[in-house]
Amino acid sequence: MKIMVAMSGGVDSTMTAKFLQEAGHEVQGCYMMLHQKPGYHEENIRKVKKVGEYLGIKVHILDLQDKFNEYVYDPFVRLYKEGKTPNPCALCNKFIKLGALLDFAKVNGCEKLATGHYVQVVDGFITCAKDPSKDQSYFLAQVPKEVLKDVIFPLGDKFKKDIKELARGVKVLEEFATQAESSEICFVENTYIEVLNKHYNTNLPGNVVDKDGNIIGRHQGYMHYTIGKRRGFEVFGAHEPHFVIKINAEKNEIVVGTKDDLAQKVVELENVNLFIDEDKFECETKIRYRSPKLEAFVEVDKSSKTAKLTLNQNALGVAQGQLCVMYDGDRVIASGFIKN
């Protein structure tokens, strides 16, 4: 089978290509240029070409910067401007890695696209990886169901520690096996504020208000804050912790309250991606990547791709713009971006 492998120059994508070649497939590699972080691509392309030479496979260099800006970077900047908390990796997987790259693979005669994500596809459903510490099902939950028949994830049934150990046994991969893992947003060097500062003045002080609109303090600029944050702003004469419970971008205002004020049981979603036919169902849900799963009842409006999620217990720090993913056991059955 002809398979295109998304290659980054890291251990996971390199071992993905190696596993598939050893299984007898005709493998091609593709490195995607997605952003303009200085010096980033040169080193990665060097690594990808080195692996390509070792494996004897063709390596494509694909410039997707325009698409990346349109579907990932620009929305990232815009959502922070609107006082929301974006999830760029979910958009990148949907529109770029399993969107534009899949199209490129097909144009080049490949039957499948493979990536180094730690996730499985079982019976047409995105399913949690065998290694729970590396599971990326959350970030792939916006990928359309019809795409899943064309993609494979060879690392989904493996443990990361085993992958790194295997990589140490291959001479050309030795420098990759010991390199630090990248876990942050690829186009963010240090903090997201540095990215936003290229487009806006984020340091515009404003008022901190309570739930009733009373001015009780000052902040350094609303884009510095996300829902649930409790530091970096001043509350006059405060003796107990205050948490950001709402961001009013138009007024350059943040609303603060107690931890109890952060609690939320009803969540509204938009851009819902549904993997099942039902429009009413019970599930377990994650309101952000690192949050525990909470039981919920979901009502979906398929025509508008919106949903109402009623949790069985309070969730803390529900942030507009973040991805909410719904599970049935280990299977992803729906996802949507938090609207309210």
From Swiss-Prot:
* GO CC terms: cytoplasm
Q: What is this protein called?
A: tRNA-specific 2-thiouridylase MnmA
Annotated family: Belongs to the MnmA/TRMU family.
Residues forming the catalytic site? C92, C186
Which locations, inside or outside the cell, does it occupy? Cytoplasm
What Enzyme Commission number(s) does the record list for this chain? 2.8.1.13
Location of region: Interaction with tRNA: 134-136, 288-289
Q: Which GO terms describe its biological process?
A: tRNA wobble position uridine thiolation
Q: Write out the residues that bind ATP.
A: A6, M7, S8, G9, G10, V11, D12, S13, M32, G116
User: Can you tell me where the transmembrane regions are?
Assistant: none
